[in-house]
Amino acid sequence: MSLPDTPTLALACELISRSSVTPEDAGCLQLIAQRLAPLGFVCERIDIGGVSNLWARRGSARPLLCFAGHTDVVPTGPLDAWQSPPFEPTIRDGHLYGRGAADMKSSLAGFVTAIERFVAAHPDHAGSIALLLTSDEEGVATCGTVKVVEALAARGERLDYCVVGEPTSVKTLGDMIKNGRRGSLSGTLRVKGRQGHVAYPHLARNPIHELAPALAELAAERWDDGNEFFPPTTWQVSNIHAGTGANNVIPGVCDVLFNFRFGSVSTADALKARTHAILDRHGLDYELDWHLSGKPFITGRGQLVAALGNAIRETVGVETELSTTGGTSDGRFIADICAEVVEFGPVNASIHQVNEHIAVDAVEPLSKIYERTLRALLTA
């Protein structure tokens, strides 16, 4: 690997070299805190349940602009499928390769170097700057950002703006900002029947047969029409299981896992109620447990979207697109204490894949976009 030629690239390489497979942090937060402390940041570790969390803040005034992200990465997959070791950052053909290069250690490096330059140029800037970082985003995400948000809320700390460094760009750096995400509501359904011999169906009740019409109705249901920010709500079955494995036994139960992805038109409670109404109408004997892993959030065209969009245009000459597509992120937790939350980072085409990479010539511009956003929001 040739030596990194910019501070952001050097820090990205140092972070990638740390094997922080979720929920491990591998010293990434300590490294970042060591860079922030000399700038006047108060760095607070909020470690919970084996998860490493960092809340670092400079200043006490409003507005508060927070950069948020995660140090953990997904597992590498088969090592022999990588062209170079995943935790040995390698520059090849104009790209930086390594696990976390795009998701999201280059963003973390960009946060830090953007802040360093901004504070050097504006030591008496308006408002406050913060970083909220966790090692529990790629895993179960129960002891990470959500717990830090709870701790901040308990002591009355609120954010005005938050940029989550998720890799949102599609084809080129800056072409997409996520200004919201759909909610995710999962159901675990068990329909009860009566087990019996397939030759004597009159002595049994087949839960698969009883459930099938209800599933068809749920699949055909139009839950809402969406709105300007979100597509219509979707309902999908992810798993169905019934039976003993024998072909002569009618099963006694049928288990189904399903999921809603929903925007701001429908609420989780409304979707639950409509689901129960359909199941009840079919006369099923059932149990249904729910898990809401994230509520939808949306940030309109306010100050943060304008500042970030202008920063992208000034840095890379791209007119960005706002989108709410894709899965959930930690933005869903931060939205509880922050009025304006967006996600922005590098191209996501290689994330969670072998040979994950980011274009070398996108690393420094990413940091400059973050710096220009700081300047727009925290200088007079």
Curated annotation (Swiss-Prot):
Enzyme Commission number: 3.5.1.18
Uppermost EC category: hydrolase
Names of the cofactor(s): Zn(2+); Co(2+)
A Pfam family hit: M20_dimer
GO BP annotation list: diaminopimelate biosynthetic process; L-arginine biosynthetic process; lysine biosynthetic process via diaminopimelate
Keyword field contains Metal-binding: yes
Pathway field: Amino-acid biosynthesis; L-lysine biosynthesis via DAP pathway; LL-2,6-diaminopimelate from (S)-tetrahydrodipicolinate (succinylase route): step 3/3
The UniProt record lists the keyword Signal: no
Protein role: Catalyzes the hydrolysis of N-succinyl-L,L-diaminopimelic acid (SDAP), forming succinate and LL-2,6-diaminopimelate (DAP), an intermediate involved in the bacterial biosynthesis of lysine and meso-diaminopimelic acid, an essential component of bacterial cell walls.
HAMAP family listed in its UniProt record: DapE
Protein name: Succinyl-diaminopimelate desuccinylase
Gene: dapE
